[in-house]
Amino acid sequence: MKRTILFLASVMALSCAWGQNLSKNEAKSLEAFMNQPAAKGGNNGQALGYAGGGISNLPGITVSNGHVTEIKWNNKDLAGTLDLSGFPALQKVDISGNKISSLSVSGTPALIELNASKNRIASVAFEGCEQLQVLRLNRNRLAEIDLAGVP
């Protein structure tokens, strides 16, 4: 009986751990952003207080079934280019109040809400955002915006 319980507990723990593994594309993209210089020195990972332990342990992200579903990085002094292209389960993003200069959310079919206000965004890509309902881009450096890929 003890062996059976121990075995079941091990299987459950292992399945929970696997459930938090991030897809390679998403992990690579987030890791690249974490290594970029932050607005006030250091890098973006340091600005978020990321202490390592796997990219799925990044503060401010929610992971479900191996995919990022939500990012909440508002007012964190982040900077650089954030490429969230091809994040199929991403639904909500709040990166407001940073110094991000470029953003791509192309190929994020589940994206419902994007708040990227109060940044330095000069370019943003939206292709394939069929579910987008809330878009906040005020106080950026956009000269024009192509919303052809947005309903």
Model-identified regions with their sequence ranges:
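Serine/proline-rich low-complexity intrinsically disordered segments, especially terminal tails, linkers
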Residues: 12, 17, 104-106, 119, ...
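Consensus "Asn ladder" position of solenoid repeat domains
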Residues: 76, 98, 116-119, 137-140
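N-terminal capping/linker segments that flank leucine-rich repeat
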Residues: 2-83, 88-92
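Canonical leucine-rich repeat
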Residues: 71, 81-82, 103, 124, ...
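Leucine-rich repeat
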Residues: 65, 85-90, 106-111, 127-132, ...
